[in-house]
Amino acid sequence: MSYGKDKMPFCKGVDCIARNGWRYNKKGKKQRWKCTKFNKRFTEDDGFWKMKNAPETIVEAIDLYETGHSLEQTKEHLWNHHSIRISETSIRNWVKKYSRKIEAYTDTLSPEVKARIHEDEVELEVNGKKTYFWRAKESKTGFKFSGPVGRRTMENCQSLNRQIKQKCYSQMLDRKKKGKKKIRFVFDKLPHYKTTHSKMFRNVADITHGIPIKAKQKGLKYNNNVIECEHTAVNERIRRMRHVEDIDFVECVLHLKDIIDNFARRRNRKSKTPAESAGINLDLGRNKTLGLIYLLFIRCPEDFILSLHQKHYKPKTTSKKYA
């Protein structure tokens, strides 16, 4: 995990941190720390730094909105059940902020591909124009890959498959070297898929192009319903977002929806999440969405400085700024 300057304490030591009271704001109190070496105070960035509402409130609003509630319904729920007054703009900003942060982390994870990968694009209406959401799904684990929201172009098709290649290409090469059965991609008759796969996955994966709905009549054991059945949930989510005009916000909502489905939603009580089925085992706790945000940041300043000390601290050299 990389550490930005905005999260850096004032020194790299591990013995110069002390508790220094509490920081109070609207959401309550938060532990404040002091660097005894430079006599400066700070609070750790746990993913909700300088936010006026509690982490549980923010995550509950995001979960409600992603499960199909409108902005107004989410706002009314928080007021009726928790006596918390929040504007619709705040909820919208939370979704955009944490969608981008979580996606930047989950894009670095590589799910194990155990069966076919089905690709398709679902038609949406944004700002009165036809728009398409490109996505893919693994048939056995149910893990989803989210592509761009845009036109039906070759570039958007390549963007989706570039993400799949980044996460799964090493598995394809390993299967080829060991002589195992290749991963198979399944998609409809859109020529963009065949052209893209011939460039990106040549000789390392098989394709089934132009899969029909009546697959058994064509001698096939499967069709593309694995991904097409997911389009209903996407259409229902967009239908709640009336008169939406911001394509970037639509993309954030749909990407965050797929991330929550991958890491926080079980198919039933006894089954695993798609990410766990794909070999990505993260200790997210009971509130998995909140746990996913905490994974992006350091929960405790001592843990942060210790990890920083182990990775970046060089005993023999001295910083020029503080020499």
Model regions: which residues?
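C-terminal domain-tail junction helix/linker
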Residues: 251-323
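Short cysteine-rich clusters marking metal-coordination/redox-active sites
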Residues: 8-12, 35-38
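DNA-recognition alpha helix
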Residues: 72-84
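Charged alpha-helix within mobile-element recombinases
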Residues: 223-269
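RNase H-like polynucleotidyl transferase catalytic core
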Residues: 204-225
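Basic, short loop/linker segments at the boundary and entry of helix-turn-helix/winged-helix-like folds
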Residues: 20-66, 112
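Acidic/histidine-rich, metal-coordinating catalytic segments
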Residues: 174-193
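RNase H-like nuclease fold core
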Residues: 34, 84-85, 90-180
